[in-house]
């Protein structure tokens, strides 16, 4: 049986889904109403949790993220003159977050899609 999937939207989620399906041999097409330049102009969040980092690596689209992203193992809270550091890595069994902009994630996924010859319209 041959499976084909249509994905609506070429944002990070749609592009990541398309890439993961492609790597499993599942044909897919991404349908986006806006131009690639418009999609890349949408500036949004830029903190990636561990699961998202892992998925980007699994999708073979995490190389630049690993080079350029800023890993954070914790953060500080300040209240009434007292500062407490929250050690995310220690409290979560080694998980971290990474600062790497959504626009950069989208660029990486678009590049991987273009390199593979997969179709987006």
Task: Please annotate each region the language model reported.
Residues 1-13:
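Beta1/beta-strand and adjacent pyrophosphate-binding region of the FAD-binding site
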Residues 8-11, 32, 101:
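A secondary-structure boundary/capping signal
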Residues 9, 25-27, 117:
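Glycine-centered short loops/turns at secondary-structure junctions
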Residues 22-43:
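Glycine-rich FAD pyrophosphate-binding loop
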Residues 40-44, 49-116:
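Active-site-adjacent segment of FAD-dependent monooxygenases/related oxidoreductases
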Residues 121:
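General small-molecule cofactor/ligand-binding pocket signal
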């Amino acid at each position: 049986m041959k499976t084909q999937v249509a994905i609506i939207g070429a944002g990070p989620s749609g592009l990541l889904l398309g890439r993961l399906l492609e790597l499993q041999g599942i044909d897919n097409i991404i349908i986006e109403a806006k131009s690639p330049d418009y999609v890349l102009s949408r500036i949004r969040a830029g903190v990636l949790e561990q699961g998202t980092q892992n998925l980007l690596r699994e999708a073979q689209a995490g190389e630049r993220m690993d080079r350029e992203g800023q890993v954070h193992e914790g953060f500080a809270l300040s209240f009434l003159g007292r500062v407490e550091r929250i050690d995310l890595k220690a409290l979560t069994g080694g998980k971290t977050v990474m600062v790497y902009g959504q626009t950069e994630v989208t660029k990486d996924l678009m590049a991987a899609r273009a390199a593979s010859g997969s179709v987006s319209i």
